[in-house]
């Protein structure tokens, strides 16, 4: 998950967030954070613009998601 941390260090870029772990048995706060990001099932992907509020949300669920930078092309 070191790659996730490198991407989080950047700002104002587009990132794709993919849910990699199940929500079963997780804390309610983490489940609500993931649902606010638009992730409900394993494999769900959403594209977001990385800003300070999104960085805070992703920091709390970093072990459950995979981040990748979206290249404009």
Swiss-Prot record:
Keywords: Ribonucleoprotein, Ribosomal protein. GO terms for biological process: translation. It holds the Pfam family Ribosomal_L30. The keyword Ribonucleoprotein applies. It comes from the Bacteria. GO terms for cellular component: large ribosomal subunit. SUPFAM superfamilies: Ribosomal protein L30p/L7e. InterPro entries: Ribo_uL30_ferredoxin-like_sf, Ribosomal_uL30_bac-type, Ribosomal_uL30_ferredoxin-like. GO terms for molecular function: structural constituent of ribosome. Part of the 50S ribosomal subunit. Belongs to the universal ribosomal protein uL30 family. NCBIfam families: rpmD_bact. This is Large ribosomal subunit protein uL30.
């Amino acid at each position: 998950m070191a790659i996730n941390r490198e991407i989080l260090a950047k700002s104002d870029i587009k990132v794709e967030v993919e849910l990699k772990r199940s929500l079963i048995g997780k804390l309610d706060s983490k489940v609500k954070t993931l649902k606010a990001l638009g992730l409900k099932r394993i494999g769900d992907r959403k594209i977001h613009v990385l800003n300070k509020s999104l960085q805070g949300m992703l920091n709390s669920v970093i072990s459950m998601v995979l981040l990748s930078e979206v290249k404009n092309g």
